[in-house]
From Swiss-Prot:
Name the UniProt record assigns to this protein: E3 ubiquitin-protein ligase RNF126
Keyword Cell division: no
Biased composition (Basic residues): 123-133
BP GO terms, sorted: positive regulation of double-strand break repair via homologous recombination; protein K27-linked ubiquitination; protein K29-linked ubiquitination; ubiquitin-dependent protein catabolic process
Organism name: Xenopus tropicalis (Western clawed frog)
PROSITE patterns listed in its UniProt record: ZF_RING_2
Stretches annotated zinc finger (RING-type): 227-268
Domain of life of the organism encoding this protein: Eukaryota
Amino acid sequence: MAEALPEAGRYFCHSCTAEIIPRLPEYTCPRCDSGFIEELPETRNSENNSSNNSGTDQNRPSFENLESAQFTLPSGYGQVTFGIFNEGLDFPIFGTSGPVEEPRDGESRREHQSRQRYGARQPRARLSTRRAAGRNEGVPTLEGIIQQLVNGIIAPTAMSNLGVGPWGVLHSNPMDYAWGANGLDTIITQLLNQFENTGPPPADTEKIQALPTIQITEEHVGSGLECPVCKEDYTVGESVRQLPCNHLFHNDCIIPWLEQHDTCPVCRKSLSGQNTATNPPGLTEMTFSSSSTSSSSSTSPTDENNAANNS
């Protein structure tokens, strides 16, 4: 009894890397005439698969005819179209892997691996405007992330509406991240700006004008005094301003500071007169004043009593 020719099934040519119908009875590739082909098992129930495919094909994007992807901008900006990436840059569809299939009845391990490798191939898209069937709702797609970034750059006020679209959500506002080479510098600048005008209030104009002006003497120069602001040494006969804490400053150095802060740049004491009787460290043995009466006021009560008894 003559043996009937087997029916040509689904085969995969490793030379052409494509699914083919082999040339019988040689079982060779009709394209390259190579015999390096592998049989792909048929599906268990073709009828069920045909009905399922008819329902899922409506939700599956056509990747072969996809030329561009349009993203809707905020109100008043229209739409923007992103072109196709390079052929070598393709992205798998998020969430289409599904659960791992178990080997079917009567199927060898090699046939199962072959079916997993070639029979269950999924299309790979460069950009898609439709949601793939069975995708996890919590996984954002590439076009969804681009859409949110476009919205955040053009209309930051519309970022409160993120998460209500069909593309999934990011974990937070994209504008809260450091984007680009200058992103970190921008964040540091914003943090530093938050500390502006958080110190003491400006000093009163009357108190600033009432600060005494004294002349630098050889005693000052010999002690190595310098302006704490500009770090320049004082010269004999130079006019400087003296704060209640006895610290000396150039007039052009201390006035702009006091117009913004009611404190001494060195000891942080205010001009209100609090704790101004105590000289700061380093000036305890040296008292600078604008009048000659300060030397007489330093006489102790004990010396006065001794002078009275001697008389």
